[in-house]
């Protein structure tokens, strides 16, 4: 009798938890623009169709640093339940107690993630992988560039947009320039800074606004740095005028993590959303919509889509490992060298 009663109580508690997860309102904070449009269509709307009693509000922000600033100001009374932002910034939030650890029992998709998607100590894992690329005007740049080394071609002088630090694209450019210089960026970037300083006079802008893709299509630049996912969309929208190059020197991952805000008002629904976003279905849909590489290793992505991401076998073999937690320890130093020696030195 007591055993039956105990099982009945457990069943009631489980059903109550599921009901909470399937009702209420949550706010997801993530990037503005194309990301918001595509993520809403590929992930948020299908989630709400699956859980019709849950309303998901999308709060857009320009970049990860702004998101962290917003969460800091709301710390005593969080208005956001889930935040998607760059891992180098979310790691800071983890250390400050802004984000809560996830319960693996409530997020079973954690078991299906790529090892590199796992964030230490149980915090929010990677939900997307992107990577650094070069983009160019296929009508004006012939032959097409094949890597970072081609930016020193005199033909491109005054036509280049290279996003500098503190933009994390600048970190990626530093790592690749170090490889060109034959040095290990973990011990020295002297060679990289020298190469980038030499490139300086050829760079029209170190801060492409609104971005390099738009400036190329608007005939202001012919070559720029960028991120693959957005570049692939602009490639399609421009009917191939914007070319996308995976650099022959390799590339580095840009990682977005999905995080449960500590003290959020609807923790159960927030956890349910995180589980859905990491699941095979949502990962497949978003990869095939916007060409971010999936973090769920069991998501079955179409070959046509996967070959346009860093997750293809050929591209994965050329990726350069980068510990973004380590990056936080050298970021200010690298930024100062860019500012003093590369940007001011041209």
Question: Where are the regions a protein language model picked out?
Answer:
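Mature extracytoplasmic/periplasmic domains
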Residues: 261-319
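A ligand-binding cleft/hinge motif common to bilobed small-molecule-binding domains
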Residues: 89-92, 217, 222-241
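Extracytoplasmic ligand-binding site segments that recognize negatively charged/polar headgroups
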Residues: 30-40, 64, 79-80, 84-220
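Early extracytoplasmic/lumenal segment of secretory-pathway proteins
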Residues: 22-89
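A bilobed periplasmic-binding-protein/Venus flytrap-type ligand-binding module shared by bacterial periplasmic
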Residues: 133-140, 176-179, 254-267, 285
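Conserved C-terminal helix/tail region of periplasmic/extracytoplasmic solute-binding proteins
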Residues: 316-346
